[in-house]
Amino acid sequence: MAKKVTGYLKLQVPAGAANPSPPIGPALGQRGLNIMEFCKAFNAQTQKEEKNTPIPVVITIYADRSFTFEMKTPPMSFFLKQAANVKSGSKLPGRDVAGKVTSAQVREIAERKMKDLNCDSIEAAMKMVEGSARSMGLQVAG
């Protein structure tokens, strides 16, 4: 028989940098989960990722205080800022241009994010990436 799920917890944790300090410690601790077990497992799975890359993680909490977690791909904004070589998006998207990304970079980001996006084709994924870029004030060239 399957374990009874009592809840889900969504966090964004830097790759290889999970530790019991806030925000991870309090979020897991108040639900009675083993904080160090999560930190060790997460850090082991993210050691091949670039350090401090934000990794969204969904933790499934069970009634017996055990858990499983699923890692997603880093946020699209992280990839776009990296591709455009900017620290943050525009304060006035649509008016001010914060940077530029090429179609090749958009395709590369779409291919990396494909498993987390709700679309079937790479072209649809590219349109989602382009929309996110425009909402950040980035110009899509090419």
Curated annotation (Swiss-Prot):
Pfam families: Ribosomal_L11, Ribosomal_L11_N
InterPro entries found in the cross-reference section: Ribosomal_uL11 (IPR000911), Ribosomal_uL11_bac-typ (IPR006519), Ribosomal_uL11_C (IPR020783), Ribosomal_uL11_C_sf (IPR036769), Ribosomal_uL11_CS (IPR020785), Ribosomal_uL11_N (IPR020784), Ribosomal_uL11_N_sf (IPR036796)
Gene3D superfamilies with a match to the protein in the record: Ribosomal protein L11, C-terminal domain, Ribosomal protein L11/L12, N-terminal domain
Gene Ontology biological process terms, A to Z: translation
Mod. after translation: One or more lysine residues are methylated.
Source superkingdom: Bacteria
GO molecular function: large ribosomal subunit rRNA binding; structural constituent of ribosome
Keyword field: Methylation, Ribonucleoprotein, Ribosomal protein, RNA-binding, rRNA-binding
CC terms in the record's Gene Ontology section: cytosolic large ribosomal subunit
Described function: Forms part of the ribosomal stalk which helps the ribosome interact with GTP-bound translation factors.
Family: Belongs to the universal ribosomal protein uL11 family.
Assembly and interaction partners: Part of the ribosomal stalk of the 50S ribosomal subunit. Interacts with L10 and the large rRNA to form the base of the stalk. L10 forms an elongated spine to which L12 dimers bind in a sequential fashion forming a multimeric L10(L12)X complex.
Protein name: Large ribosomal subunit protein uL11
Organism of origin: Rhodopseudomonas palustris (strain BisB18)
Biological classification of the source: Bacteria, Pseudomonadati, Pseudomonadota, Alphaproteobacteria, Hyphomicrobiales
Originating gene: rplK
